[in-house]
């Protein structure tokens, strides 16, 4: 018995050591980027790596915020690009001038938050309907959604690009937001959570005279809240880091996101790694904040989703 306990303790210690090593390996790139943002160019390009900055400087952030200026926001006349001689939207209101990096950050936050909110709303409704409603073709529809999860974005790029152009959404942030709203993974995740809602609870709500909307908002939403929290994090990070779609759908300088802006910082003949690391550090802050804010729901969502799946 005692040997068995010692053997289990040894396994736990080995597992803990492996997990710590993996955590260090995953966290090291973030550490290197953040510390690199505060290093001098000479320290970054040194032959011997400098694991910890000997001198902390803000020169990279000063360069990042002094490269060029842009309005904090712009409100354009809808569909005005069709009537403009330059093909650009006609701006009727613009915010104060700020560093371009701040504008990139504002564009990305708006895009990611809008995609997160709209995806959580549509996915929770669709998942609930697929889990609790009986209608013809339900199984076929869910099978198509699962199949859509396996399709890479490159497969639907041309139809999606033509659709956004037809809807006059091309070269707007909505061209990146709208395709995310129908994210198949979100519908799949919400269906898994909705299946765990007791049917008796919903039946009693109908007997009490609750409408479909009231049943959904007062019963379904509170019970799938952990799943919504997990989906919110997934959607926010997916939209924030979706460099490919942003590169294809956005062409104007005023529509640049933080990912496109960082890529633009690379010069043709030389690369200022300190400047790029400063931009990457700025881009990582909102993701870290969102993860910390939704960490409880994210952990619950992953655990409960795994059990229900």
Go through each PLM region and give its residues.
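A structural signal for multi-pass alpha-helical bundles of membrane permease subunits
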Residues: 6-7, 11-309
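Juxtamembrane low-complexity tails/linkers enriched in Ser/Thr-Pro and polybasic
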Residues: 1-4
């Amino acid at each position: 018995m005692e040997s068995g306990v010692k053997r289990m303790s040894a396994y736990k210690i080995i597992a803990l050591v492996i997990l710590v090593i993996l955590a260090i390996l995953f966290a090291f790139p973030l550490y290197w980027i953040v510390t690199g943002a505060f290093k001098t160019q000479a320290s970054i390009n040194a032959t011997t790596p400098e694991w910890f900055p000997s001198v902390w400087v803000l020169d990279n952030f000063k360069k990042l915020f002094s490269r060029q200026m842009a309005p904090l926001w712009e409100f354009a006349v809808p569909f005005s690009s069709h009537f403009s001689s330059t093909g650009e939207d006609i701006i009727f209101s613009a915010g104060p001038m700020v560093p371009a990096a701040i504008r990139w950050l504002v564009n990305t936050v708006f895009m990611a938050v809008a995609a997160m909110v709209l995806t959580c709303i549509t996915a929770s409704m669709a998942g609930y309907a697929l889990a609790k409603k009986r209608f013809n073709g339900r199984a076929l529809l869910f099978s198509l959604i699962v199949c859509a999860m396996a399709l890479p974005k490159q497969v639907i790029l041309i139809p999606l690009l033509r659709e956004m152009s037809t809807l006059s959404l091309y070269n707007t942030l909505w061209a990146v937001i709208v395709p995310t709203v129908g994210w198949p993974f979100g519908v799949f995740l919400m269906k898994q959570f909705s299946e765990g809602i007791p049917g008796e609870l919903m039946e009693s709500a109908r007997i009490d005279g609750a409408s479909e909307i009231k049943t959904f908002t007062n019963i379904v939403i509170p019970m799938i809240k952990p799943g919504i929290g997990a989906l919110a994090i997934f959607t926010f990070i997916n939209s924030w880091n979706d460099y490919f779609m942003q590169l294809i759908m956005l062409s104007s300088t005023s529509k640049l996101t933080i990912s496109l802006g960082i890529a633009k910082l690379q010069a043709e003949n030389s690369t200022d790694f300190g400047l790029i690391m400063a931009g990457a550090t700025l881009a990582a802050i909102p993701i870290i904040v969102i993860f910390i804010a939704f960490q409880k729901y994210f952990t619950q969502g992953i655990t409960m989703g795994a059990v229900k799946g």
